[in-house]
Regions:
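Short S/T/G/P-rich N-terminal loop/turn motif that feeds into the first structured element of a domain
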Residues: 1-56, 65-71, 99-100
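C-terminal structural segments of small proteins and small subunits
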Residues: 64-94
Length: 100
């Protein structure tokens, strides 16, 4: 299995909306992806509740059967649409991919 985890720190305001509205838009868009991309085995989206200075705002946890399935997901047009939305509203991104 391949696990793909992404963390985002959102801008205070972007695209005419505040941080909370943009987090909701991104979260909803991500949660719609499993119905559109069959290679996704597991997808969870979570908001940070601790709000420490080192914390990111939103996390994505996904699992795939193989590296090839991850690559298919990353190249999928629906994923690209969400990625375009994310790039416009986040200040920082951290990613890790690993096999287990």
């Amino acid at each position: 299995m391949v696990t793909h985890i992404v963390f985002w720190r959102f801008l205070d305001e972007a695209n005419g909306q505040d941080r909370e509205a943009n987090m909701e838009r991104v979260s909803s868009a991500l949660q719609a992806l499993p119905a559109l991309i069959p290679e996704i085995e597991t997808l969870e989206v979570g908001r940070d509740f601790n709000r420490s200075g080192a914390a990111f705002d939103l996390a994505l946890y996904t699992r795939f059967a193989s590296r090839e399935h991850l690559a298919t997901y990353q190249a999928h047009p629906e994923h690209q649409k969400v990625k375009d939305l994310v790039v416009a509203v986040v200040a920082e991104t951290a990613v890790v991919d690993y096999e287990s």
